Amino acid sequence: MKHITQLLAAAAVSMAIALPAHAETTLTVHYPMPGFFKDVMDTISKKFMAENPDIKIQFASPSATYEEGIQTILRQVGTSEMPDITFIGLNRLRMLNERDVAVDLGPLVQKDGNMAEQGFSDTILKLAQVKGKQVGLAFATSNPIMYYNADLVKAAGGDPENPPKTWDEVIALGGKIKALGNGVDGIDFRWQGDDWMFSALLFGAGGKMLSDDESKVAFNGPEGQKAVEVLHRLVTEGGMPVFTKAAGEQAFAAGKVGFEFQTTGALRNTIKNVGNKFDLRTAKIPLINPANGHLPTGGNAVVILTHDAAKQDAAWKFAKFAAGPYGASVVVPGTGYVPNNELAAKSADYLGDFYKQNPLFQAGLSQMPEMIPWYAFPGSNGVKVTQTIVDNLSRIVDQSAEPKEALDDAAADVEDMLPRS
């Protein structure tokens, strides 16, 4: 009898373990760049599951880059391998939308009713919209800032407490830093690889890539001409050499460059690489037209792919959590990305004290009102279009072409690549 009682007790325990206390929804989540985001995703998912025990988060194999990420998702569409949620580069949201892959979050935003109270202002929401459609929620966002070597600025007669606020001032001081000699260069501007930093100059002048109907190139208009003229002057007057991206970053971190212009997302690594070699400072990037200028937003957004009703509810909870104040409080300190949530930026419960204690991060934060979406070209030639622009920027930097010539050549080539209705 005692043996039977023990067996029954053991069976009862076994059944208690086997049967969940509540129904569980499992979400498969895909993300890119594990070097940046693995720890971030692990931290966010653990916190989310602790607060939502009926939802389990499991991760698909991450992609090395944004480009690999979008290609992976497009290959998996319509298969059992497609995840329920993905994190996609902001400039590739259009590809998902044009192929009708992403779930329209507009109805979920409307149903929620209080997104602004959760820190999702209209400005923040627009970062992950495509032609007014809410394709995702911005997760990790960045804007371009000015990094500067306060020691070199001071040596060249500048005031580190009052860094340049216009491109004319940057160029003049860069030239003076170059004149210090000893292998020192004035400026590094990350024009390589994509059109993001060209967008910073173009949007900063109040310009745009294409006409409103996207049928004609607009980046070679007056604003674009001003943008490439600044790039030209950075070289001819400001002491900017022909750096590769990596070489420019290394030279700046070694104390051999006065100013560096690139993403705030590189801030944590820059702080680490500079160490105690010099007095590192950051400031807002100048706008060619301060009254009407804007800045492109880099980074990625969380996108819902599942059309299963039960999973969509769970996915919406996770998307808001990841892109919300807690998620931002995990992403920002570990990377340098700016918060994509206004509640996180202002509240002492999240990042308010962080910015007070880490002033180098304030430049990117202060530029949030100027952020607009990183433009994505229509059609299937987006990658070719971007490379065409970069190739012609290279001609300006290496001085093998005049700014207007290179810009007009880029415009003519891009015009031929645009889709025809």
Predicted regions and their residues:
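Short, well-ordered beta-strand elements
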Residues: 24-35, 55-60, 84-85, 135, ...
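C-terminal capping/gating helix-and-loop segments adjacent to ligand/active sites or protein-protein/ligand interfaces
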Residues: 359-413
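Extracytoplasmic/periplasmic substrate-binding proteins
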Residues: 197-200, 228-311
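Extracytoplasmic "Venus flytrap"/periplasmic binding protein-like
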Residues: 43, 47-120, 129, 155-157, ...
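Periplasmic solute-binding protein
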Residues: 93-101, 106, 123-162, 190-213, ...
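Glycine-centered hinge/linker elements that transmit conformational signals in sensory
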Residues: 171-178, 213-242
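Mature extracytoplasmic/periplasmic domains
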Residues: 107-110, 249, 265-268, 288, ...
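Hinge/lid segment of periplasmic solute-binding proteins
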Residues: 90-143, 171, 201, 275, ...
